[in-house]
Swiss-Prot record:
It comes from the Bacteria. PANTHER family: TRNA(ILE)-LYSIDINE SYNTHASE-RELATED. Belongs to the tRNA(Ile)-lysidine synthase family. GO terms for biological process: tRNA modification. It comes from Anaplasma marginale (strain St. Maries). Pfam families: ATP_bind_3 (PF01171). The N-terminal region contains the highly conserved SGGXDS motif, predicted to be a P-loop motif involved in ATP binding. This is tRNA(Ile)-lysidine synthase. One of its GO terms (molecular function) is ATP binding. It is an enzyme of class 6 (ligase). The gene is tilS. GO terms for cellular component: cytoplasm.
Length: 466
């Protein structure tokens, strides 16, 4: 059973408590949190400490108002009590609090990893819906050490061993971890001296979880503090090495890859074979992630055979991986094309002249034709304004698909052409991109920007700050 822990009143306030509060408030004060931010609070001692520090900061700096978020994934009966406890504590400190509940399909897995995924999904959804760009979490130095050991057990490379960072990116949300420089013991001492109350989660003591196993392993060592310090020092070394590798990945980008205005990537095989294997591997990984619209890497077991064949110049039949189709071209290079079956079939158009991000590959604009008069353009815009008619509601962007190709696309690789966007109304295609239109005031579709190259560069940055 979980329960609220209320420490006895302390006889004195040690120097370490004052130091933690001063350093943490200085860290919080240095963060760029314009426009408001959210604070993830589970009710444990770490997050309650963060909540207390944020409330103290808000009293002196009321420019950015925080919102406390606490999640209930429904795995434990005590979760309702814990979320209400957090809400009551937040309100007592003068802060707004939202309880986030997982109301989607139930999962058979109730592991800590599944709970974490659900929690982050809830947090990201709320932040996105409320246009909140910054999220604070209470990860600490001890969490970092345990994470490194867990990744080491899984055989992680430099990415995994570089651990968590004080600033990272999750989708379009920036996550800050202001307590990452303090151990769990330092935070516990602070909370005790400050007479804070918190919730004890029994799963944190359950040895069936690997994190608990490694937590106990560190605690049973001769000098736990030294072990934590050295493991965290390892993450710093690995992060520097990762930054170095990603620097060379970025500098090799245009040498090894060619980005087509038709929204696919050509891997220049000879150039790829001339760079170190680690650089080549990451370039191919990033290409698959960007083209497939993914933020995570493909399975190693499926990815490695493709990389090996490319580096060795071997032939292979076209194959799909990570939402992409990879094929060898007659010139010996390889193309990475979006897999048609993985593209969302319909994206509705609400207004004329809006720019839409489509399939994370194209920025698309819907316009009236350039040869329409001003009066016609006004009429067209009004026709497709907000609160649209039934006709406008049926206007959407969709991939061209496996039907017949228009004349201006017959010279294009069929896989590429089929994955291109078209403007449709009902079951009829109204317009294709890269085509001259002369059809009065009918809306047209144009590609404002191809986003694939930018997507690869963003992924490089996110790997450094994840």
């Amino acid at each position: 059973m979980s329960g609220v822990r209320i420490p006895l009143f302390p006889r004195f306030i040690p120097h370490g408590t004052v130091k933690l509060e001063s350093a943490a408030l200085k860290k919080l004060n240095s963060l760029e949190l314009s426009g408001g931010y959210a604070v993830a609070v589970s009710g444990g001692v770490d997050s309650i400490t963060l909540l207390n520090l944020v409330a103290a900061l808000h009293k002196t700096q009321a420019t950015s108002r925080p919102v406390v978020l606490t999640g209930n994934h429904g795995f434990r009966a005590e979760a309702d009590h814990e979320t209400r406890f957090v809400q009551k504590r937040a309100v007592a400190l003068g802060l707004d609090c939202e309880i986030l509940r997982w109301n989607r399909h139930r999962t058979s897995s109730k592991s800590q990893e599944t709970a974490r995924e659900i929690r982050y999904s809830l947090l990201h959804q709320w932040c996105t819906e409320h246009s909140v760009k910054f999220l604070l979490t209470a990860h600490n130095k001890s969490d970092q050490a345990e994470t490194v050991l867990m990744h080491l057990e899984r055989g992680s490379g430099i990415d995994g061993l570089s651990g968590m960072h004080e600033r990272s990116v999750f989708g379009d949300i920036t996550i800050y971890r202001p307590l990452l420089g303090f151990t769990r013991q330092e935070i516990l001492e602070y909370a005790t001296q400050k007479q804070l109350s918190w919730v004890e989660d029994p799963s944190n003591q359950d040895p069936k979880y690997r994190r608990t196993f490694f937590r106990n392993l560190i605690a049973e060592s001769k000098n736990p503090g030294v072990v934590v310090d050295r493991l965290c020092r390892t993450t710093s070394h690995m992060h520097r090495a990762l930054a170095c590798i990603l620097h060379y990945v970025r500098s090799s980008l245009d040498y090894c890859l060619e980005f087509s205005p038709l929204g696919f990537i050509t891997v220049k095989s000879q150039e790829l074979r001339s760079v170190p294997e680690e650089i080549a591997s990451r370039l191919l990984l990033l290409s698959l992630m960007a083209m497939g619209g993914k933020d995570h890497k493909p399975r190693y077991s499926a990815f490695w055979p493709i990389l090996t064949k490319i580096l060795q110049g071997q032939d292979f039949t076209p194959r799909t991986l990570h939402g992409c189709k990879v094929r060898k071209e007659p010139d010996g290079n390889f193309s990475i094309v979006r897999e048609l079956a993985r593209i969302e079939t319909k994206i509705g158009v609400k207004t004329i002249a809006e720019t839409i991000q489509w399939d994370r590959r194209f920025a698309i604009k819907i316009m009236c034709t350039h040869n329409a008069s001003a009066a016609e353009t006004t009429s067209c815009s009004a026709k497709h304004a907000p609160n649209p008619s039934e006709e406008t509601q049926n206007l959407y962007i969709t991939p061209l698909g496996n039907g017949s190709l228009p004349e201006h696309l017959v010279h294009v690789n069929r896989d590429v052409a089929c994955s291109l966007p078209v403007l449709a109304h009902g079951d009829k295609v109204l317009a294709y991109p890269w085509q001259n239109h002369n059809i009065g005031v009918s809306p047209t579709i144009s590609v404002e920007e191809v986003l694939v190259r930018r997507g690869v560069i963003n992924l490089i940055c996110h790997q450094l700050y994840r």
